[in-house]
């Protein structure tokens, strides 16, 4: 089975469009292309119960971000100030870049 194409990169600002965190904006912390999932800052917070270890002698309940499906996030265009679809464009010097479909702003 083919792996899904992930349309966002680490460091992009995205908005969640579906689910319990719909409407929240955040920065992409990591991308898992094999699973088609992304971890977004401040989105899909889960609680993990951890035992005390030498690295973390306190233990306890830790809150951290869990991955969300990449299909549930859209890249956020700062010029349009809204989530947008992206297109790919090859510039005159031959470099590939991502472009906002609404306003034509170069994202990369």
UniProtKB/Swiss-Prot annotation:
InterPro entries: KOW, Rib_uL2_dom2, Ribosomal_uL24, Ribosomal_uL24_CS, Ribosomal_uL24_KOW, Translation_prot_SH3-like_sf
Domain of life, source organism: Bacteria
One Gene Ontology biological process: translation
GO cellular component: ribonucleoprotein complex; ribosome
GO MF: rRNA binding; structural constituent of ribosome
The protein's assembly and partners: Part of the 50S ribosomal subunit.
Family per similarity comment: Belongs to the universal ribosomal protein uL24 family.
Protein name, as recorded: Large ribosomal subunit protein uL24
Organism: Moorella thermoacetica (strain ATCC 39073 / JCM 9320)
